[in-house]
Amino acid sequence: DETVNALERKAAEMCGREAAVFVPSGTMANQMGIGIWAGRGDEVYAHVDSHILIDEAGGTAALWGAHPRGLHSAGHDLDVEELLEAVPMDASDVHRPLARLLCIENSNTASGGRVWSAASLARVTGRAHELGLRVHMDGARLPNAAVARGCTLAEASAGADSVSFCFSKGLGAPVGSILVSSAEAISHARRLRKRLGGSMRQAGIIAAAGLYALEHNLARLADDHARARRLATALAGSGRVSVDLPSVETNIVLARLRRDEPAQGLVDELAAAGVLCGAYDRRTLRFVTHLGVDDEAVRAAGEIAARVLT
């Protein structure tokens, strides 16, 4: 499809890579990004709370037979010492799986949408490559990370061997994600897409929305970030939750419960009052600003939440 081809060329160019492949979802893009680098018995490293480890139905093991291993420091930064401890010192040691892939997330959901700095990204991807690992970046919200840093998509994903990002999150398209990498890797990924049932006919109508989003909705992500900070400030003044304001770098706000009460109960209270959020875990509320949330909505949500959470 001509429009799909145009979208793939545009995404690859913006990310500074040779090629790209359009897929229905971010999970599929991530799993293809794992499958091109790792196989049965290989070890794949990712943050213990990363989307790849906990929110993709065990795909790393189920689809590719790879062994996932969680790292505690690989959120919006990574302690390379932890990676050094995890990777076998001797690749010929038959007791250990072969270390193949490090997965990182930018922006990082578990830390509330925090962004990898250029220095951290260069340090970690460089060390991973020295250890013989490939690096896949789950960039579901890579556009948010780039806008927050004031850089390009290529700069926000520098050093990664493959990168996924979504059109249907902050960019506002109805559906679709993309995987970018070298031409050789994407050729392999296209075969994996077919196996996963992700090849689509007449997909130009949804690819067109992705193209529009890249051309018109990228810079406006700064508005979402500003609104998230305003909402975070309103929430921080309430009595039942606390918010780490410096951590609100993009469009995600995590509000930690001060009392021993279930987060889902507060989600229900807020929903009844007209504010929608989610329970990130048992003690944390998660608020996300996006294309459908304007200044008035943030003002109203802040006032209602402050009242409910007092």
Where on the chain are the PLM-derived regions?
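Conserved PLP-enzyme active-site core in the AAT-like
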Residues: 1-258, 263-273, 278-293, 301-309
